[in-house]
């Protein structure tokens, strides 16, 4: 599945002829399932960097697109857009015009991302102003309390997430009542007036658990935090208008921790969290600097107190339950939250699905040569929009359909016009 997906991502070749200033490409997006799909992401890796792009549908209507510089070299090498809907067994066709010059076109933002330092001169939790794009810390340095909302946060109008900047690297979640972008206003911490006005809030306590799909080590039969790294970098590398991408680099990680390792045994692990407009799931891509087949890892979901469990025994796991989203000492102004959590790991990478314990629904994963893609998702019972999910059965039905969607992505084909 991973190989098939990567082929679809890298299908756009020879994007710019050396003698031309512009080039047109035909892109077909084909749904091979017998059900309709919505918010279908299309991500194309460009062979040559470009300055601007224009995407038109089959009716000649311009649709929003996004150019990204994901490797930080100052050049746009990735193009993405989102197809609103594709019928069962149907295809949609687009014309992509790429130009060496110009700037990316402006569109109404459908996603948002932020990362910031805590400004101790500002007491309000939703008016912080020390925005940054990236931060690197050395081994043994923990910036968790220096960063507002403890790491980068990102959202679309359905869901919001944040990644903790410490050895846990947990994905935590923010549930919404309505479909709207909110983090610029609430900064993950809505005040009482914002709550009264219908803004969302943190809906999950994660502690040292996996939260929603954190990837960690596995050694000596136990989950291990990403404790021993030469350096750790978290960056917001794409901010919209259609997708956000958060990049996490654990450089020189000792995968044998708490045992020691040689310098040669250390490995770099780079993780990308990608959230597209119109979707409640997040795509997680993990890359290693060398063959990692011998390394075992762990991931999973927090065991929400009293939750019901779902598993297909082949990499898909979920739970639905209700608990306080914060510790007891911080519970004033909060209510118990009901959430559904889901994770989908390629079955080929699952070494074992462990029984639930008091903290987690865990997996041991591995058999990864250089890369692995998995997906995480959630729903909040607070959702009042039509796509809202409000029961364990409805959420588990969604998980089964979601797995088909992510494991059988639309086929993307490209040709020179």
Residue ranges and their predicted role:
Residues 21-126, 131-133, 137-142, 149:
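Alpha-mannosidase-like glycoside hydrolase catalytic domains involved in N-glycan trimming
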Residues 269-275, 280-313:
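Acidic (Asp/Glu-rich), glycine- and aromatic
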Residues 10-19:
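Hydrophobic h-region of N-terminal signal peptides that target proteins for export
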Residues 54-80, 258-264, 305-324, 344-350:
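Solvent-exposed beta-strand/loop surfaces of large extracellular or lumenal domains
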Residues 95, 100-227:
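Solvent-exposed N-terminal domain segments of exported/luminal and surface proteins
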Residues 194-277:
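Extended, loop-rich substrate-binding clefts of extracytoplasmic carbohydrate-active enzymes
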Residues 69-86, 341-417:
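Beta-strand-rich recognition/accessory modules
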Residues 1-5:
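Positively charged n-region of N-terminal signal peptides that target proteins for export
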